Amino acid sequence: MAKVQFSKSEVLELATTHRVIPLIETLFSGIETPMSIFEKLAADKPGSFLLESAQHGVWARYSFIGVNNRGLLTQDATGNVHWTSSTHQSPLADGSTNLSNSGLDAVAQIQKSWTTVSVADLPPLTSGLVGVMGWD
């Protein structure tokens, strides 16, 4: 993977059209594994995750670790959508909490609100929604 870093002026320029800009630092991991790094970073922080990429049941080249999530979006048995903040912040970039009462529409609304810069030399996930969707 090529080394990708943005200058301050590039970050400011990207911020005019995107709400999320990945800040990248490449570190040598030595004997660390994705799980050992996750355990050190997550340390009982709610909403943390370790997502391993895999192709055809075989480990692939990326491990994604998320810590200090913004919040949790759920839909109860009656169909009402609920946002539970982990950071005392709204789910939307404009600061509002007016989410659609349709679960999938609320997910789309949050995703659209937090546009992410796509960088060719980075893994396909630099930020975004991570979770589980179930239905009956």
Language model features by range: what are they?
Residues 1-136:
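Signature of the chorismate-utilizing enzyme
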